[in-house]
């Protein structure tokens, strides 16, 4: 919420918003946050007893086996590297950053999703393929048919789309802020770019699309970096938190470093 306030130029409301958030959460025994960055953000604004509880991913649904030759031909009949984005086309996602990616030689850009900024983005990036909203098998095939997944928004508390791309065997270029910091290991399963230096975003994408060895290495590590994070395992962790609170162990969470 505070991140959205920044994007929509409501900065003056942020202190009041954080006080409101803290007042609500401090009535609970613990607060579960989806990423290390979210834990830090909440604690630094007065929220107590915060514990990281990351999200799971369906590694069967999001799988390299869904890579589809016909779909790849639709995305790029010229044999270009396919760079994809999946998400809501709204201001806070900062999808306009993809303008520079679309200009890279040998790249075909695919934007999956819908939202209030779609018409504007279609005019800004006429060379991109806008698929609209996708779900189910269609979405699984789209993820697996990308060569690179590029994420633009810098205010993500987690970013499930990154997990889904990685589970699909696709290396990721994402901002070194918020949730992506827990998901992307720089140079291992993708690249992190500096939000303060806009050019590092397109540089990260360019490294993968022009360096075959780098692309192959990061792609080979992508799925393994998240496939252990099944929904069964993360829900078991959640049940453990419930049990701890039910047994009166909430004080043990104070200052927890998870």
Q: Which residue ranges define each predicted feature?
A:
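A short, well-ordered alpha-helix in the C-terminal region of glycosyltransferases
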Residues: 214-228, 240
